[in-house]
Amino acid sequence: MMTLYPVVVQERTTGEVLMLAYANEEALELTKKTGYAHFFSRERQKIWKKGETSGNTMRVVEIRRDCDDDAYLYIVDFPEDKVACHTGNRSCFFKVEHRFEETGSPTFWLELYRLVRKRKEEMPEGSYTVKLFKEGKGKIAKKFGEEAVEVITGYLQNDRENLVWEIADMMYHLTVLMADAGVTVQDVMRELEKRRK
């Protein structure tokens, strides 16, 4: 009988969990050989390469086994403009079943970036973000600069509560600036990763 291993797929730079699929030994070997994510379809009873038909391929940079050697983690490079889920969502894990409390998720900046980018694409009425985009680069740069100065002021005044507030404002305006310039969170995370020593 063929052994199937659950495989969790995680984006390298953001840590975002993209999907869960299954792999047999052959799919694992194909992944190692080609550098692209391969799985075994339980429904079709055959090997498949992720993105073979959709173009949303996943370049695997690392494969990890769990402590019991019965599950795997594919760490992948997966550009921001690609989707992992057949529904058209970036991640297959988009349905919130239950939230115990706000957790300050490490992927929140990514979620914020996507929301800001969506505002830029759809331009809904009454949105402050849309107002910034309509006013252009000069206004976006000015607002980011103002918020950066307020962060410095909060820091120098040793006012932690105000500093957190101002950093949040600055991060929001930085995210607007990035979306307007076409710079993604992944771009920034990759650059930071290069600098890690």
Swiss-Prot record:
Pathway: Amino-acid biosynthesis; L-histidine biosynthesis; L-histidine from 5-phospho-alpha-D-ribose 1-diphosphate: step 2/9; Amino-acid biosynthesis; L-histidine biosynthesis; L-histidine from 5-phospho-alpha-D-ribose 1-diphosphate: step 3/9. Its main location: cytoplasm. It is an enzyme of class 3 (hydrolase). The keyword Hydrolase applies. Residues 1-108 are annotated as: Phosphoribosyl-AMP cyclohydrolase. Residues 109-197 are annotated as: Phosphoribosyl-ATP pyrophosphohydrolase. GO terms for molecular function: ATP binding; phosphoribosyl-AMP cyclohydrolase activity; phosphoribosyl-ATP diphosphatase activity. GO terms for cellular component: cytoplasm. It catalyses: 1-(5-phospho-beta-D-ribosyl)-ATP + H2O = 1-(5-phospho-beta-D-ribosyl)-5'-AMP + diphosphate + H(+); 1-(5-phospho-beta-D-ribosyl)-5'-AMP + H2O = 1-(5-phospho-beta-D-ribosyl)-5-[(5-phospho-beta-D-ribosylamino)methylideneamino]imidazole-4-carboxamide. Keywords: Amino-acid biosynthesis, ATP-binding, Cytoplasm, Histidine biosynthesis, Hydrolase, Multifunctional enzyme, Nucleotide-binding. It is found in: Cytoplasm. InterPro entries: His_synth_HisIE, HisE, PRib-ATP_PPHydrolase-like, PRib_AMP_CycHydrolase_dom, PRib_AMP_CycHydrolase_sf. Its EC number is 3.5.4.19, 3.6.1.31. In the N-terminal section; belongs to the PRA-CH family. In the C-terminal section; belongs to the PRA-PH family. PANTHER family: HISTIDINE BIOSYNTHESIS BIFUNCTIONAL PROTEIN, HISTIDINE BIOSYNTHESIS BIFUNCTIONAL PROTEIN HIS7. NCBIfam families: histidine_hisI (TIGR03188), PRK02759.1 (NF002747). This is Histidine biosynthesis bifunctional protein HisIE. It comes from Thermotoga maritima (strain ATCC 43589 / DSM 3109 / JCM 10099 / NBRC 100826 / MSB8). The gene is hisI.
